[in-house]
Design a protein with these regions (language model features):
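Cleavable N-terminal export/targeting peptides
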Residues: 1-32, 195
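Short glycine/proline- and aromatic-enriched beta-strand/turn motifs that initiate or cap beta-hairpins
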Residues: 25-85
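Transmembrane beta-strands of outer-membrane beta-barrel proteins
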Residues: 32-41, 74-78, 109-113, 152-158, ...
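Outer-membrane beta-barrel translocator domains and adjoining extracellular loop/strand segments
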Residues: 42-54, 83-91, 118-132, 163-172
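Hydrophobic, lipid-facing positions within transmembrane beta-strands of outer-membrane proteins
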Residues: 57-63, 92-96, 136-140, 183-189
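Outer-membrane beta-barrel translocator/channel fold
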Residues: 80, 111-135, 152-162, 182-185
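Outer-membrane beta-barrel "beta-signal"
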Residues: 146-148, 181-195
Length: 195
């Protein structure tokens, strides 16, 4: 089972517009430095006509700085591993996230992430690699008071495209015809220090 990224995107766009139009929902002049662990086993990996929703594992981490006006940004790194058509796939992406937070000790955050760098590997005897990745992510977080800061948790939905894949053997370069498309959902759990 996986979430439809297009539907999530529409939902987040609607909520974001409501929040940005309303200036009465400031973040109560609290700055936050947040650290997250990302983990999930839901998703869909597609390579041409071959699709799998089984044995998908995503792990990662994120650091996020939220200013007193509610705007935030930070990097997020994720690695997804699966087996597709008897081939081992490793998909790594480095993303830049931006967000908007409302509330004080109890908070709500909506955010968007964009893939900036990454690497994909396909292994099954031969090894195909790519350093090209594009895609985006949406996330929603809730925060509650906890020891000089906050506990923060929520969901992140990501869609990334890796490719073109190629290998070089005996000076000859071979390229795969189709890219790999990864759609995954992760839990985001972390701690935020208030300042």
């Amino acid at each position: 089972m996986y979430f439809d990224i297009t539907s999530l995107r529409r939902f987040f766009l609607f909520i974001s517009l409501v929040l940005f139009i309303s200036t009465s929902y400031a973040a109560d002049d609290i700055g936050r430095l947040r650290y997250f662990i990302l983990s999930g086993d839901q998703g869909k990996i597609t390579h041409g006509t071959i699709v799998t929703e089984d044995s998908i594992k995503t792990q990662g981490a994120s650091i996020h700085l939220v200013f007193a006006n509610g705007m935030g940004f930070g990097p997020a790194m994720m690695t997804t591993k699966t087996t597709l058509n008897s081939q081992s796939h490793t998909l790594y992406s480095e993303n830049i996230d931006v967000s908007y937070t409302i509330g004080g000790e109890w908070s709500f955050t909506l955010g968007y992430g964009r893939a900036m760098n990454g690497r994909g590997e396909i292994k099954n005897g031969d090894e195909y690699v790519t350093s090209s990745v594009k895609g985006d992510a949406l996330f929603m977080l809730f925060g509650m008071p906890f020891v000089f800061g906050e506990l923060v948790g929520g969901l992140r939905g990501s869609k990334h495209e890796f490719g073109p894949y190629q290998k070089t053997e005996n000076g000859t370069e071979t390229q795969l015809e189709q890219n790999i498309i990864s759609q995954t959902v992760q839990m985001m759990l972390g701690y935020g220090l208030h300042f």
